[in-house]
Amino acid sequence: MVPQTVNNARRLIMFGVAMGATAFAVGATADPPAADEQPPGTLQEITVTARKVEQRLQDVPISITALSGADLQAQGLSNAQDIVQSVPGITVSSAGPGQAKYEIRGLSSVGGESPTIGFYLDETPVTPPASATTGKSAIDPDLYDLARVEVLRGPQGTLYGAGSMGGTVKLVTNAPNTRAFAASTQSTASGTDGGGVNYAQKGMLNLPLIQDRLALRIVATYAHESGWIDRIVVPDFPLETNSGTTRGNVLGQAARIYSDVNDEDLSGARVSLLYKPTDNLTITPAVFYQHIYQGGMNTFDGDPGTLAHYQPFDVREPFTDRFTVYSLPITYEMDDLSLTSATAYWSRQSSQLEDGSEAVQDGLQLPAFDVSAGGVGPVQAFEFDDTHQFSQELRLASHGSPRVQWLIGGFYSDYYDQLYTGGGNIPGLLTAADGAFGTTNLFNVHEPLRVKEVAAFGNVTANVTDSLTVEAGLRYYSYHSDLSSTATGFAYGGDTPVIAAATASASGLNPMLNVSYHLNPDLMLYATAAKGFREGASNFPIPTTGSVGSVCLQNLQAIGRDSAPGQYDPDTVWSYEVGEKGRFLDRRVTFNSDVFYIHWSDVQQPVALACGLGFTANGSAANIHGAEAELEAEIITGLTFSQGVGYAHSAFAQSFAASGISAGQSLFDAPNWTINSSLSYARPVGDFTLVGLVRNSYASSSEDLSYQVNRLPGRDRLDLRAGVETKRWSAFLFVDNVMNRHNILENIDLLTFTGPSYNRVATDRPLTVGIDIGFTF
C-alpha cells in the first residue's frame, strides 16, 4: 500500500508539472513583451540581491520569495515572524518575541545549538553558533521602512556559509535618499481577546544633507503588546503523581492571579548615513538598536491546558532581549568591477527568569513544596546570554562582460558568547532531606564560548548562449571553537568548582552547480545541486557523581555511554532541485514551481536524559523530498490572487535510540504541508484607493521534542484587512486570527530539570482587532 504522504507528494508534483505545461503552452503561443518592458497592469517586478548582485526576482534560478516594502505594508506584516504567513515552505516555532526558530523544507533546528537557516540584516549575518537555550533564536526586528524581505529556499552554503543549510532569510533596509526629503509615521491601536490594548508608534525621517553626496535616514519604533496568558499561584499545590509523569490537579482555589503577564514592550531605532565622496564610492554606516521586555513567558502549562501557568509560589518570569548592530558597507565601482566591503559588529544580551519550583521538587523527589514540610521553597531559575560578533566580508565582482560574470570573496568572523545559567539561591536546600544537599546552590554554570571562522568563496556564471546559463560556485570554510565551563552546586557535587574545557574544529568545501535555460524572455527552467553545512560544537559536561549525577550516569549507561560526548560534528546536506519560473498572459500571471530532494548527513539531535539534563549528538541521516509552487494572478484589474504551496516529506534513514528516533520517523518541527493564500483588491475612487485583503496561512501537524516527543496540531490562521489609501495618508481596519485559534507553536524545555508533567506550550496571539493609520510627507 502506498503511504498517503507519497500520494500527496505525487499529486503536488503532478499539479506543478501540469501548471508548468499549461504555462509553457500559454507562453509559447503568446507574443511576450521585451524583457525590459513592464506593460500597465502587469504584476510588480522586484529586484533582489540574493546572489550578492542585483537581479530581477524572476531571473534568479533558485527557489526564492521576495516581499517588497509595499507588500509588507499592504499585508500588515510588522515583524520577522509574520513573513511565514506569506511564504511557502517556511515555518516558525517561537516561545515569544526574540525567540523565533525558522525551518525551511523540513530542515529543523531541534538538535544542535545553531540554526539551520541563515538570518541577515542587510550585509550582516546575525545567526551565531550560540551555546544558550536561545542560541537558535533569530532576532525579531520590526519591519517598518524595509525595502524588502528575501527568503531563499535550499542550501546557500556557497555565498552565505555556515547556518544557511536550509535557506536564508534576508532583511534589506531602505538606504538614505540623497535627492529628496521624506518622512512617514504609522500609528496602530488594537485589542486582543483575553488580553488588553495594544498600541504602536513608528516613524521615518530622510534628510538629504548634500544633494547626490550625503543623506541621513532615521527610523524609530515603539510598540506595546498586551499579554493573554495568566500566572496563577495555587495554595496547597498538589504534588506530581505516578513518579512525575502525571500532574496533580491545580485547578483549585487560587491564592493570587496575575492576568496577561506576557505583555511586551519593544523600542528600537535605526540610523543610517549614505556618503558618496565620489560617483564611484558609496559608504553607508548604520546603527540598529532594539530592546524587548516581556513580563512573562508566551507559554502555558500543557496540563491542564488552560491559557495559564500554575505555580506553588509567586515566581516572576520576565524576559529581556537587547540587540545592537553596527555595520559599515563600502562599495567602490570600477569600469568592469565592483569591490564591496561589509564590516559589522553586533552584540546581544538576553535574559530569562523561569519558575523552577515544580521541576526541582519533582526532580529531587522531595515530599513537599514548602520548606516547613520538607521542600525547598520557591525556585527562580535564570539564564543570561551575552553575545558579541565581529564579521568582515570582502567581495570583488565583475559586471563588464555579457558572457561571463564572476565573484570572489573572503569572510572572517570572531564570535564570543558568555552563558550564565543556574537555579538561583535556594535557602531551603540546606534544610530539605535532613541537610543532605549541603548547599543553597542547586546549580550555577558559567560557560564562555569563542568561535572563529574563515572562508573563501567564488562564483562563476557563463552565458553559454542567449538562452543557456551555467553557474558554478565553491566555498572553503574552516572554524575552531573553544568552550570552557565552570559549574558549582548540588547537581555538580557541591560548591567546589567543576572545571572543564573542550575544543571543536572542522573545515570543508561547499560546492554548487546551477544550469538555467530561457525558453523565452518570460519562461525559465533551471536545475541546481548544492551543499550546505552547520557548524558543530562542544557539549557541556553532564555530572556523573553526586545525587543528580549518579542518576545521570545510570541514564548514560543505559544508552551505552559513561559520559556525554565532548563535541558533536558538523551536519551537512546535499540538495537537488529542478524548477521553472514563468510569467504569462501579458505578465498578469506569475507561476513558479520546483521539486527537490535533500540528503541530510549526521543530523545533530538532542539527547534528553531522565535525570533532567541532556546533550547533543550526531544521529542518523535523514532524507527529505518535496515540491513548492507559487501562483500570483491579476484576475481583473485591481483584484489579485496569490497562492503558495509547500510540501516536504521528511524521514530519518536509521534509528537513533539515544533520542528515541526510529527509522522512517518524520523530522521534528517539520510539517508536511504549508499553504499560504491571499486575495487582495485595490480600486481607485477619485483621490482615494479602496483596498482590501483576505489572507489564510496553514501548516499541517508535526512533532517536536522537549523531554518527550509531542504532537503539534496543524496551524490555521485567517486575517482580514481593509481600508483607504491616498498619496498622503492611509487608514486600515484589521482583524488578525479571525477564528481565534490558539495555535500551538512549540513545547519548550525548562532551564532546570525538564519532564513531561510540567511541559510548557507556546501559542500565538489570539483574535486581535484594530486600526492602523499612516501618513507620508
Q: Where are the regions a protein language model picked out?
A:
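Gram-negative outer-membrane beta-barrel transporters
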Residues: 407, 463-466, 470, 590-600, ...
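Outer membrane beta-barrel strand-and-loop segments of large Gram-negative receptors
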Residues: 31, 369-398, 436-437, 443, ...
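Short acidic/polar hinge/loop motifs at secondary-structure boundaries
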Residues: 125-153, 201-203
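N-terminal Sec signal peptide and the immediately downstream disordered periplasmic leader
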Residues: 1-85, 279, 283, 633, ...
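Transmembrane beta-barrel wall of Gram-negative outer-membrane proteins
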Residues: 182, 194-295, 322-325, 387-392, ...
